Amino acid sequence: EGNWYYVNGKGDLLLGAQTIDNVKVYFDTKGVQYKGHFAPDHHYYDKDTGALVTDRLVKDGSKESYVDKEGKIYNGVKDLGGIQYYFRDGEKVKGDFDYSNSNLYYYDKETGALVTGKYFQHKNNWYFANGNGKILTGKQVIDGKHVYFYNDGYNYGKKGIQAKDKLVILNGKTYYYLPDSGNRAENVTLTVNHVTYYFDNDGVGHILR
C-alpha cells in the first residue's frame, strides 16, 4: 500500500521514535513509517524521506505549521523570507487577528501574511492596518480623509472597526461618519436618527431641530 517499514537485525519491526543512520524517524504501532504528517511525539516527518523536519514551514492536510530547530511546533510571530506570520495553537493564522498584546494585528485570509498599509474587510466590517501592521483606532486622517475606528480595550470584537453611518461622540462633540466611505461629514446638513444636524468645517454636529 506504499507504506514503509524497518526491520532490525533480529527481524523485528521498529516502532515509535528511532534513529537510523543518524536520521530521526518515527513508526506507528503497526510499524508504518510516518511521512508527511505529525507523529504522536508532536514532530513532523518529511513526506518523501520520513526524516524529522526542523526549522521549516510544514503542511499536514489543510493545517500549516512551523517547526523550530528542534522540530518542535512553534507558536507566536515568525518572519519567513521577510514576511511576518503568526502561529496559534500550532497552526498558521489566516483571516484572523492576533490578540496576544495591546496592539491588534490581522493576518491575510489566503496567505496568512501580516496585512500592512491598507484597508481590509473582516466579517463585514472595515479596518485599517498601518505600515507596521498595527490596526488603527480612534480619529485618523488617511489619504486626507477624516475617519474613525472604534477603540474599545475591553471588547476586542469591536476594537478597530471603522465607523460608518454612525454618530460618534468625542470629548462632548458629535461627529457623523458617512455610510459608504466612512469619511467624516463636513459642511453639510443631515438628518440622522430623526435629528437634523449641521456638521461644520471641522465635522462638529450642531442640532438644528
Enumerate the language-model features and the residues they cover:
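Extracellular adhesion/carbohydrate-binding repeat motifs centered on closely spaced tryptophans
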Residues: E1-R209
